From Swiss-Prot:
Protein name in the entry: Protein LURE 1.1
Record GO cellular component, one term: extracellular region
One GO BP: pollen tube guidance
Domain of life: Eukaryota
Gene name of the record: LURE1.1
Disulfide bonds: 58-75, 61-82, 65-84
Keywords on record: Disulfide bond, Secreted, Signal
Function: Pollen tube attractants guiding pollen tubes to the ovular micropyle.
Tissue expression remark: Expressed in the pistil. Detected exclusively in the synergid cells.
Major subcellular location class: secreted
Length: 94
């Protein structure tokens, strides 16, 4: 019985670490297109790309919080910071 419990505990631990690593690697593969040849020094193009990156990062942060049944508390694209609330989302049944 102890062996089964230890095995299941290790399995849960390994699977949670694996999912975190997979999520981080998939985030690194995201590329937001910026073509400096088309607009070499156009700050508006660069600002648009940064807005897309910020929106995408905070959207992913919100989805991660919702998967944990929590609200998003803080999202900072510049500092790569995503924090969820301590309280759970209250579901209303109508």
């Amino acid at each position: 019985m102890k062996l089964i419990f230890i095995f299941l505990t290790l399995l849960i631990f390994v699977s949670s670490c694996t999912s975190i690593l997979i999520k981080e690697s998939s985030e690194e593969e995201r590329i937001y297109p910026f073509n400096p040849v088309a607009s070499p020094f156009d700050p508006r193009s660069l600002n648009q790309i940064l807005k897309i990156g910020k929106i995408g990062y905070c959207f992913d942060c919100a989805r991660a919080c919702m998967r944990r049944d929590r609200y998003i508390r803080t999202c900072s694209f510049e500092r790569k910071l995503c924090r969820c609330s301590y309280s759970h989302i209250h579901h209303t049944h109508g």
